[in-house]
């Protein structure tokens, strides 16, 4: 699971409904949860990391995207809709290194 790009239901800020969005699994926790990083199509955040087709070992996203290491969350694995790909170990380590840097 670690390093997989998955599609999950992501709630709107007012919790009125949700939209399916990609996320990167960083930690497959024992039990029902995993720690994920948000993936979006915009990289306006200073810590966003570009995710290109070349970063995938398998699968892909439909267009260039950005992993947001400052947007981490715990998510119930049973709610994952599908796996769309797996990123390279180098890309996963880049994300983890950025998280460590952010933590200071």
Where is each model-derived feature located?
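Conserved functional hotspots at enzyme active or ligand-binding sites that engage polyanionic ligands
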Residues: 1-104
């Amino acid at each position: 699971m670690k390093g997989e790009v998955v599609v999950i239901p992501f709630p709107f800020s007012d919790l009125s409904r949700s939209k399916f969005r990609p996320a990167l699994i960083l930690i497959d926790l024992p039990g029902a949860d995993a720690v994920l990083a948000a993936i979006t199509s915009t990289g306006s955040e200073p810590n966003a990391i570009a995710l290109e087709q070349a970063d995938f070992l398998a699968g892909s996203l439909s267009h260039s995207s950005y992993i947001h290491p400052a947007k981490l969350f715990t998510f119930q694995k049973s709610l994952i809709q599908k796996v769309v790909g797996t990123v390279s170990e180098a890309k996963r380590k880049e994300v983890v290194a950025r998280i460590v840097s952010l933590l200071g």
